[in-house]
Amino acid sequence: MNSALLSRLSQDLALLSSGLQLANILKVTQMTTLSPKQSNRFIIFIVLTLSLSLRSAALPAEPLSADVLIVGAGLSGLSAAYHLKKAGKTALILEMSPHIGGRIRTASYPDGAHAEVGLEEFWENNPAIEIFKDLKIPMETAYSSFSSFYYQGKLYPFIQDSNPEFLRSVLDTDELQAYKRWDAKMAELYRQLQQRPLPDELLTLMETSFADWIKNTSGLSPKAQELVRIETEPEYATSWQKISALDGIAEWHYFSGNGLAPRHVIGGNQRAAQALARFIGKDRIRLNQLVTHIKSTVSGEEVTATDQGNFKQQIFRAKYVVTAIPLFRLNDIQFTPELSAERKQAIQTQSAGAYFTAHVRVDNNAARSFWTYNGKSVLPIMTDSPLGVIYEGESKPGGDALLNLLVSGADAERFNSRMSDPDQIQETLLTAFDKQWPGFRQAVKQMSFYRYHPRAVASWPVGRSRFDELSDSLRKPQGRVYFAGDFTEDTHSNGASQSALRVVKDILQKSD
C-alpha cells in the first residue's frame, strides 16, 4: 500500500470519526434543556473545534531538520558534514558546548602569542589533510615523528634530518641492528592488521601488555626499550603497561621506518575547525545543544536536545543520525530502541588516556638557551617527567617565549583531579624544570593551566583492543544510527577523520 493511499485512508477515518462525534453531540444537545439559540451556538463551537482538529490530523509530518543529524562538532562531526555537503546532502550538527572543534583548541594571549590547548598535530596520513588542502588551509611540518628525549638524565637532541640518522646518534651499532630487526617485524605485523578477520596469532596479543611483550620478545636493549616507551606513551596518554601488544603494534606504525610527519596549521589548529565550520555553514551548527534522546521511528530519527543556556528542549528530525562524540558520552543519551548489549559492553569496557596542558610564559632572552643546541631549537622534547612533552608555542619577535607542556598519563590524571591547588601544580612543574634545566624557574613569568575531561583520548585495556569484535560492533550502524569519532577507531585524530568517511560512505550507499 503506497503512502498516498495510506494518507487518504487516514483522512477518511478522521472524517468518519469526526462525523460520529458530531452526531452524538447533536443527540446530546437535543436531550438538554438549552434554548434553540444556545444550542445553535454550542453546535457551531463544536463544529469549529472538530474542524480545527481535522485540519491538524490531515497535516503532513513535521519537516526534516536535515538529511543527517550529527551529534558533536569535533573533527569527526565537522568532517562528516563536509563530506555530506560535497555529496549534496544536508546535515545539521548539534554540539553540547559553546566551542566548535572538539579537542582542536588554540589559546591566544594579549601579547599576540598562541599555543595549542588540545590537539597538537595532524599526522600526514590523516584524511583530514585532504580536506584542509581543499579548503586552502595553510599547514607546516616542523619536526619528525621522533623527538628529542631525556633518558637517565641525559638529553638526546633531535638535530638530524631523519629518524634513521637520529637513531644512529642514540643507539650503538649492536643496539641499532637489533632495533632494525624488531622494527621490520613490527612493520610486517602492522600490514597483517589490515586483514579481516585477523589471524589468531595476532588476536592473542590482546592478552599481554605492550610493555611485557616488548620486554620478553623484542630483543631490544634497555635503552631502545625506553626509547619506544618514552616516544609512544604521549600518543595514547597512558602507560604502555595498560594497553595490549596488539594496540601497541598499531601505535608504533607512526614511528616505524622513516616515520610519519606531523602537520600543524599555521596560526593555530583552531583555524582548521573555523574553516570547516564556514564551509559547512555556521547556521548548520547549533551550539550548547545537549542531546538527551535518540528515538528511531518508522518515518526516521527523532533527536531531543536541551539548550544548555535556558534548558529548553527541542526535537530535531532526520533520515539518519551520526553520533560523533567520545563513546562514554553515549551514556548521556537515552536510545529508543536501546543500544544492543554488545555495544553497551564495548562502551563500558573501553578505557582512556588523560592529558593536561600548561602554557608557560618565560623571559625569551634568559630561557632560550635551555632548549637550543648550537643555536638550533631541539623542541619538542619528551621529558619523561611531570613536564610531559615540551612544545614551543608561537610568540611575537622580541616578546616572551611561550612553552606548551603536554602532560599525559598518571601526571595528567593527578593534575586534572584538582586534589592539588594551582600553586602546588606550579611548584611541581618548576621543580621538574629546575631538575632538568637548573635555574630555569627564574625565567618563568606565568603559567596557565588547561584541563581535559579525564577521558581525553580512547584507549583499550589489556584484554580489549580496537580490533576486537566489541569495537567492530560500534563501527556498524544500529538501524539508521551511526557511531563515529576517534573513540570508535583509534587514539588519534586520524580515527575521527576515518570514522567520518566510514559513516558517510554507508549513508550515501543507502540513500542512492
Model-flagged regions — what are they?
Residues I43-R55:
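Bacterial N-terminal signal peptides
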Residues Q194-H293, T297-G300, D307-G309, A324:
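Active-site/ligand-binding neighborhood in enzyme catalytic cores
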Residues Q289-L406:
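Mid-domain catalytic core of redox enzymes
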Residues A354, F370-D512:
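Conserved flavin/dinucleotide-binding core of flavoenzymes
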Residues V68-L92:
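N-terminal Rossmann-like FAD-binding beta1-loop-alpha1 element of flavoenzymes
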Residues E140-Q241:
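Mobile amphipathic helical/loop "lid" adjacent to a hydrophobic cofactor/ligand pocket
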Residues K86-A107:
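Glycine-rich FAD pyrophosphate-binding loop
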Residues G112-A142:
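Conserved FAD-binding subdomain of flavin-dependent enzymes
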